[in-house]
C-alpha cells in the first residue's frame, strides 16, 4: 500500500498499475485474497479487553483484596467455612461484573451493526452492493448523491461531485471535487481529486479507486491517536474510591486495636483474637457493595437503552446525572435535520408556505422552478440530495406536485451545476411558454443579474433581511427565455425575477420542553454549531437557550482570547456559531475550570477530541462516525437532545437510588460493628460468628439493596440543582444518618444479645443477636426509601421489589433458624417462641424509632 502523500500526485494510470487493478475492478477471487491480506475495512477498537481480563479486573478492588486476605488467613487458622463463603461471594461478584460489562459492549456492537454502511463496488466488471467492511485496496467503488464513502481513494470519474467532509476536516460546506492531478504536498481539505472514508456525497456522481482501507485511512489515523487517551473517572468512581480508602483505613485501624486489646490487655488466645478481628472486618466491609452498584447501574443502562441512549460504560449513567452544563450541536440534535420551507415571497408579499395559493400564476411558476432546478429526489425509500433541495421537493409534494412527473414532462436539456464561487445553479427546459433557463441561488448574486429597478431590488433586499433575521435560509429564483438549449455562464444575466423561498431546519417538537427541564434542573444548555450566528440565534431563542442576559458569538470572537479570559467569558454566552474543533475543546475546558461537569455532543471525527475532553461525551448514533462513538461515553440512537435530558433524569435517579442502597448497607454494617465493639469492651462473648455476618451482608442484605436501587424514578430530581463537582457520597449529613440509624439497630441487637445471655447462654445469645440484626436490617430497607417517614403512607408499598426482597430475606432467616441440618452450618441454637417474639418486636421497633427520627428531622427542616 502506497503512502498517502503520493496518491493525489500520481496519475490514475500509475495508480492502476501500482495497485494491480483496472477500471473494471477486481475479480472476486483477487478481492478475497486482498481482504485476507489487508484485513476488513473497519476501524479497530483499540484496547478491547478479553472476557478473562475483564473478569480478573474485578478482583483488583481494594475491598475485595482485603476480603481475599481475610479468607486466606481464615483458612490458615482452620476456619474453612468462612473462607469458602467469602471466596464464593467474591467470585459471584466478579462474574456479575463481567457479565454486565460484556453486555454493555454488546449493546454498542449491535448499534454498529444496525448502522453498518454498504458500498456499490465493481467486481468482475459488474456493479454489486457489498457491506463496507468487504471493500479492499484496488476496488473500484461507485458513488451517487447520498452515499457514505467507505474508504479513501483517488477519483476516476467525476460529474459535479460534492462531498461533505465536515466529519473529517471540520469544513461546514460540501467540497467540490475534480480529477486534476495535484503537485506538491497539500493539506487534507485541498486534495480535491480524492475522497475519504467517513464522509458522504451530497451532489453528483463518481467512481473512485480504493487506495486505503480501515486503520490506514485518514479517519483510521485519527482513531489510532485516540486509543491512548486517558479516560476521566466519573464522580461515582471518585466517590467510591474515596469511600474505599477511608473505610479500609478505618477497618484496619479498628481491627488492629481490637486485636491488640484482646491479646495484650485481656490475655486472650492469639487465634481467637484474630478470628474476632476478622469477624469485625467482615461486619465492617459491605461485601455486596460493588456488585449492588454494578447491578443498579446496569439496570440504569438497560432502561436508558430502551429510551434511545446506549451507555458505553456503566459509571457514565451517574456521570450524566451530575452534569451541570450540556454543550449541544444544533443540527439534528436540537433541530430535525430536515430543511423545511417556511415562507415564499412573490408579488412583493411574504406568504407563509402553508398559506400559499398555487393556482395563482406567479406562485405556480415559482414552485415549478423550484422543482425543476433541483437534483434532489424524495420517494418511499427516502430522500437523496442536498437538504435545501429536498425541502423544495417536499414543498411541491405537500401541494400535490410530483417532482418525478414534472421532470418527466419538462426534461432537463442542459445545466450549469451549482458552484460555491458563482453561488448559482441553472437548468434548461422546454416549458409551455418556450425554451426557458431556470436559475436559483444566493439572493445578493441573483439581484445583480436581474432586470429589476433599484427600487425593486431594495424592496427585495429588505424582505430578504427580514427573513434572514428570523433564522431562515433564503434562495432566489429567476428565469430567462432562450433560443437554443446550449448555455454558458454568460447566460446567467438579464433574468426575470420569480421570487424568494425561505426555509429552515426547524426545532424538534420536544426540544423546547427539554431545554426548559434542563434550566429547571440547574443545568446550563449551550448551543455550539458551525452554522451562521443569525440562524443559530433564531433557533436558540425559539427553544429557550438564548435568553435575555446571554449572547451569541462567533468562533472568531474567542479566537484571540486567552484561556483565563475565556473562563470569565463563557457564562455570558449561550450560543457559539462558526466554531472550529479547537474552539469546542477550549469552551468545554473553560466550563470545567469553573467547577462544572460538562456533557458534549458530537458526530464527526473532528468532534472526538472535544468528546474526550468533556466529562461525558455524547455521540450521535445515526449521523455519528465510528470514531466519535468510540470517544464518547454515551451514544444516542435517535440523535435527540431530549434523550440527553431524559438520560440526565435517569442518571440523577440512579445516583439517588445507589445512595439509598449504600446507606442501607453502611448503616446495617455500622450496627454490626457497634455490637461487636460493645461485646469486646464489655468482656462479653463474641456476638456473631463470621458466617452470621456473611449471611446477613450477602444474602439478606443484597436483595433489599438491589431493590432500593430499583426504587421508582421520580420527576422531582429535576427540580434540584446538580451536585457540586467535589461532593462525594460520604457527606456529613449522609454519615450522620448512617451513624444514627446504625446505632438504633445496634441497640436493638445488644438488647437481644443480653436477653439471650440471660435465657440460655452464649449460643442462644449469639443466635438472638444474629436473628435480630438480620431482621432489623430487612425492616431498615423501608427506612432507606426516603429522607422522610414512609410508614403508613403509599410510599411504603410502592416498590414491589423491596417487598419481595423483605419476604425472601425473612424466609431465609426462618429456614436457617428452623431447619435442623442448617443449624450447625450457620452456628445457631434452638429458640423458644417467646424469644422469637422478642426478636420480631425489637426489629420492628428499631424501624419505628428511625421513622420517628426522620419525622423529627423533616419538621426541623421546615
Regions found by a protein language model. Name each.
Residues 724-743, 763-767:
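Membrane-water interface at loop-to-transmembrane-helix junctions
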Residues 1-719, 729-730, 743, 770, ...:
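Conserved cytosolic headpiece of P-type ATPases
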Residues 680-689, 753-765:
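Helix-coil boundary and interhelical linker segments in multi-pass alpha-helical membrane proteins
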Residues 784:
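A C-terminal functional module that forms or caps the active site or interfaces directly
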Residues 700, 745, 767-781:
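Generic alpha-helical transmembrane segments
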Amino acid at each position: 500500500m502506497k503512502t498517502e502523500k503520493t496518491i493525489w500526485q500520481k496519475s490514475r494510470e500509475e495508480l492502476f498499475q501500482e495497485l494491480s487493478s483496472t477500471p473494471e475492478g477486481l475479480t472476486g477471487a483477487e478481492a478475497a485474497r486482498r481482504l485476507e491480506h489487508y484485513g476488513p475495512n473497519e476501524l479497530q477498537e483499540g484496547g478491547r479487553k478479553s472476557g478473562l481480563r475483564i473478569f480478573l479486573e474485578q478482583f483488583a478492588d481494594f475491598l475485595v483484596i482485603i476480603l481475599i486476605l481475610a479468607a486466606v488467613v481464615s483458612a490458615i487458622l482452620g476456619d474453612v467455612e468462612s473462607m469458602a463463603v467469602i471466596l464464593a461471594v467474591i467470585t459471584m461478584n466478579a462474574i456479575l461484573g463481567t457479565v454486565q460489562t460484556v453486555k454493555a459492549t454488546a449493546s454498542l456492537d449491535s448499534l454498529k451493526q444496525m448502522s453498518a454502511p454498504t458500498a456499490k463496488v465493481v467486481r468482475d466488471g459488474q456493479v454489486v452492493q457489498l457491506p463496507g467492511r468487504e471493500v479492499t485496496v484496488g476496488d473500484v467503488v461507485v458513488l451517487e448523491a447520498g452515499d457514505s464513502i467507505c474508504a479513501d481513494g483517488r477519483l476516476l470519474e467525476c460529474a459535479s461531485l460534492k462531498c461533505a467532509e465536515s466529519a473529517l476536516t471540520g469544513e461546514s460546506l460540501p467540497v467540490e471535487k475534480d480529477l486534476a492531478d495535484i503537485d506538491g504536498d497539500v493539506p487534507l481539505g485541498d486534495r480535491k481529486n480524492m475522497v475519504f472514508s467517513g464522509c458522504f456525497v451530497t451532489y453528483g456522481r463518481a467512481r473512485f479507486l480504493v487506495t486505503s482501507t480501515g486503520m490506514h485511512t485518514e479517519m483510521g489515523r485519527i482513531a489510532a491517536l485516540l486509543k491512548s487517551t486517558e479516560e476521566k473517572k466519573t464522580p461515582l468512581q471518585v466517590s467510591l474510591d474515596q469511600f474505599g480508602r477511608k473505610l479500609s483505613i478505618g477497618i484496619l485501624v479498628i481491627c488492629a486495636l481490637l486485636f491488640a486489646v484482646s491479646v495484650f490487655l485481656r490475655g486472650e488466645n492469639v487465634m481467637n483474637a484474630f478470628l474476632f478481628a476478622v469477624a469485625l472486618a467482615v461486619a465492617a466491609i459491605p461485601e455486596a457493595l460493588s456488585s449492588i452498584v454494578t447491578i443498579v447501574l446496569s439496570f440504569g443502562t438497560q432502561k436508558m437503552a430502551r429510551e434511545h441512549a446506549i451507555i458505553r460504560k456503566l459509571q457514565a449513567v451517574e456521570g450524566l446525572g451530575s452534569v451541570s452544563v450540556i454543550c449541544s450541536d444544533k443540527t439534528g440534535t436540537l433541530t430535525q435535520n430536515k430543511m423545511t420551507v417556511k415562507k415564499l415571497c412573490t408579488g412583493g408579499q411574504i406568504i407563509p408556505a402553508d398559506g400559499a395559493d398555487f393556482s395563482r400564476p406567479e406562485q405556480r411558476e415559482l414552485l415549478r422552478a423550484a422543482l425543476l432546478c433541483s437534483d434532489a429526489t424524495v420517494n418511499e425509500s427516502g430522500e437523496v440530495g442536498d437538504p435545501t433541495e429536498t425541502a423544495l421537493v417536499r414543498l411541491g409534494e405537500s401541494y400535490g406536485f410530483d417532482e418525478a412527473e414534472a421532470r418527466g414532462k419538462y426534461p432537463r436539456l442542459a445545466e450549469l451545476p451549482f458552484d460555491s464561487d458563482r453561488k448559482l445553479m441553472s437548468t434548461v427546459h422546454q416549458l409551455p411558454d418556450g425554451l426557458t433557463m431556470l436559475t436559483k441561488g444566493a439572493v445578493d448574486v441573483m439581484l445583480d443579474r436581474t432586470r429589476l429597478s433599484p427600487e425593486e431590488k431594495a424592496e427585495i433586499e429588505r424582505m430578504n433581511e427580514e427573513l434572514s433575521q428570523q433564522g431562515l435560509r433564503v434562495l432566489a429564483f429567476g428565469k430567462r427565455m432562450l433560443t437554443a438549449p446550449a448555455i454558458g455562464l454568460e447566460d446567467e444575466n438579464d433574468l426575470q425575477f420569480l421570487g424568494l423561498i425561505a426555509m429552515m431546519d426547524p426545532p424538534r417538537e420536544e426540544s423546547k420542553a427539554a431545554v426548559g427541564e434542563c434550566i429547571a434542573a440547574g443545568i446550563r444548555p449551550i448551543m455550539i454549531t458551525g452554522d451562521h450566528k443569525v440562524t443559530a440565534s433564531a433557533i436558540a431563542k425559539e427553544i429557550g437557550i438564548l435568553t435575555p442576559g446571554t449572547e451569541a458569538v462567533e468562533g472568531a470572537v474567542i479566537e484571540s482570547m486567552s484561556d483565563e479570559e475565556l473562563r470569565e467569558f463563557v457564562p455570558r454566552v449561550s450560543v457559539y456559531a462558526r466554531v472550529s474543533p479547537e474552539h469546542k475543546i477550549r469552551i468545554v475546558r473553560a466550563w470545567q475550570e469553573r467547577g462544572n461537569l460538562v456533557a458534549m455532543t458530537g458526530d464527526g471525527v473532528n468532534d472526538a477530541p472535544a468528546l474526550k475532553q468533556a466529562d461525558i461525551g455524547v455521540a450521535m448514533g445515526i449521523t455519528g462516525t465510528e470514531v466519535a462513538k468510540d470517544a464518547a461515553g454515551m451514544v444516542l440512537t435517535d440523535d435527540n437532545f431530549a434523550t440527553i435530558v431524559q438520560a440526565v433524569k435517569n442518571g440523577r435517579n440512579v445516583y439517588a437510588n445507589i445512595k439509598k442502597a449504600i446507606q442501607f448497607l453502611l448503616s446495617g454494617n455500622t450496627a454490626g460493628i457497634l455490637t461487636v465493639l460493645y461485646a469486646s469492651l464489655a468482656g462479653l462473648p463474641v456476638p456473631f460468628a463470621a458466617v452470621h455476618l456473611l449471611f446477613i451482608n450477602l444474602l439478606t442484605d443484597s436483595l433489599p439493596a438491589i431493590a432500593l436501587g430499583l426504587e421508582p424514578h421520580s420527576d422531582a430530581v429535576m427540580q434540584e440543582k446538580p451536585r457540586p463537582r467535589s461532593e462525594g457520597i460520604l457527606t456529613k449529613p449522609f454519615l450522620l444518618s448512617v451513624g444514627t440509624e446504625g446505632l438504633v439497630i445496634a441497640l436493638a441487637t445488644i438488647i437481644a444479645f443480653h436477653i439471650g445471655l440471660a435465657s440460655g447462654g452464649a449460643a442462644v445469645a449469639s443466635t438472638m443477636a444474629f436473628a435480630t440484626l438480620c431482621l432489623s436490617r430487612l425492616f431498615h430497607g423501608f427506612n432507606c426509601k426516603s429522607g422522610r417517614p414512609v410508614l403508613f403512607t403509599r410510599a411504603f408499598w410502592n416498590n414491589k421489589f423491596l417487598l419481595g426482597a423483605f419476604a425472601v430475606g425473612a424466609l431465609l432467616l426462618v429456614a436457617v433458624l428452623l431447619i435442623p441440618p442448617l443449624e450447625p452450618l450457620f452456628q445457631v441454637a434452638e429458640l423458644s417462641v417467646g424469644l422469637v417474639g422478642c426478636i420480631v418486636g425489637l426489629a420492628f421497633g428499631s424501624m419505628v424509632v428511625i421513622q420517628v427520627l426522620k419525622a423529627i428531622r423533616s419538621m426541623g427542616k421546615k
